[in-house]
């Protein structure tokens, strides 16, 4: 008689999640999405001279436990204080350590085009590669939609970079649209197409490209037909948004019924998101139907405050899942 032994499901890790001040709202959402996440706190203070005065609460209680830190390197001024905590946590006799850095901010500065250029993406990767090991081994570094996938090779062997994507959140939202069967995906350039097209194979596609015309660089449709379609432009990040606006104009001129956009990282320096709000659009032809972003850049999300056409697709559930890897 053959005895079949049922395989027991793998027990989920209990995670103690620390977070920086600006990620508090996202951390609360991560904890709410899973009963395995337990929020911990840090006292973020400064001395009179401006340098950090930091204290990790419950340092003794987390010994032997799995620990994660949710970071946001939104400006150079906050990186030092967070790096100080990130380097301290693995030394508290914890079982494992995971750094969640939803947006890798120097990711677009990865190339040296002439002698003298400084590839700050490599610099930040080297700093993170120096994170001390915990009792469980190397630190896992979770990053969403890093600008160039080859940047995984910038990290040293003492950390384990884990690259996730926000595209499943977009796919879920697209399925909820009333015109879900009329969606076409557009890419603003070949780089975005190479990066994301394999995740979006179920949709017709349009690829745009910048071409030089005299002294100007203008956006043209390289391939695909947007006529009569709800076209969604997909890219990893947005800064000023100039390219997205030019793509929108070209797609509308070629007969797109509606144009929307998705980016994982809404950087928007100097409040450049205001160019996209419906109150600041010149006319209906210049408006995006939807502009989907994630909460990888918390300060931007707070500033936008759900003004149309913006909608926030939270990474919270995805982060909770990534912490179980």
UniProtKB/Swiss-Prot annotation:
Q: Which reaction does it catalyse?
A: D-ribose 5-phosphate + ATP = 5-phospho-alpha-D-ribose 1-diphosphate + AMP + H(+)
Q: Which Gene3D superfamilies match?
A: 3.40.50.2020
Q: List membrane-spanning regions.
A: none
Q: Which UniProt keywords apply?
A: ATP-binding, Kinase, Magnesium, Metal-binding, Nucleotide biosynthesis, Nucleotide-binding, Transferase
Its needed co-factors are:
Mg(2+)
Where on this chain does Mg(2+) bind? 145, 147
Gene Ontology, cellular component aspect: cytoplasm; ribose phosphate diphosphokinase complex
Q: Which GO terms describe its biological process?
A: 5-phosphoribose 1-diphosphate biosynthetic process; purine nucleotide biosynthetic process
Top-rank taxon, per record: Eukaryota
* Residue numbers spanned by region Binding of phosphoribosylpyrophosphate: 228-243
SUPFAM superfamilies under this entry?
PRTase-like
Spell out the InterPro entries in the cross-references.
Answer: Pribosyltran_N, PRibTrfase_dom, PRTase-like, Rib-P_diPkinase
What is its EC class? transferase
Put simply, this protein is called: Ribose-phosphate pyrophosphokinase 4
Q: Which organism is it from?
A: Oryza sativa subsp. japonica
């Amino acid at each position: 008689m053959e005895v079949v032994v049922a395989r027991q499901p793998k027990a989920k890790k209990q995670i103690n999640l620390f977070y920086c001040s600006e990620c508090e709202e996202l951390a609360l959402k991560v904890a709410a999405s899973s009963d395995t996440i337990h929020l911990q706190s840090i006292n973020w203070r400064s001395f009179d001279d401006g340098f950090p005065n930091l204290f990790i609460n419950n340092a003794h209680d987390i010994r032997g436990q799995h620990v994660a830190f949710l970071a946001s390197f939104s400006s150079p001024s906050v990186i030092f204080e967070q790096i100080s905590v990130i380097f301290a946590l693995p030394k508290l006799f914890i079982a494992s350590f995971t750094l969640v850095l939803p947006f890798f901010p120097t990711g677009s500065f990865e190339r040296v085009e002439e002698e003298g250029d400084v590839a700050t993406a490599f610099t930040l990767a080297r700093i993170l590669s120096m994170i001390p090991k915990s009792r469980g081994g190397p630190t896992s570094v979770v990053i969403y939609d890093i600008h160039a996938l080859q940047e995984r090779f910038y990290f040293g062997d003492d950390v384990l970079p884990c690259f996730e994507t926000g595209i499943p959140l977009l796919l879920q939202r697209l399925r909820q649209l009333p015109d879900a069967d009329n969606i076409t995906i557009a890419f603003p350039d070949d780089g975005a197409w190479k990066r994301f097209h394999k995740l979006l194979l179920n949709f017709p596609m349009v690829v745009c490209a910048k071409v030089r015309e005299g002294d100007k660089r203008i956006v043209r449709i390289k391939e695909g037909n947007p006529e009569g379609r709800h076209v969604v432009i997909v890219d990893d990040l947005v800064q000023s948004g100039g390219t997205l606006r030019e793509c929108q104009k070209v797609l509308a001129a070629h007969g797109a019924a509606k144009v929307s956009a998705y980016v994982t990282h809404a950087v928007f320096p100097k409040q450049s998101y205001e160019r996209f709000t419906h109150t600041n659009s010149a006319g209906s032809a210049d408006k995006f139907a939807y502009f989907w972003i994630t909460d990888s850049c918390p300060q931007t999300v707070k500033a936008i405050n759900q003004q149309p056409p913006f909608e926030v697709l939270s990474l919270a559930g995805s982060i909770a899942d990534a912490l179980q890897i």
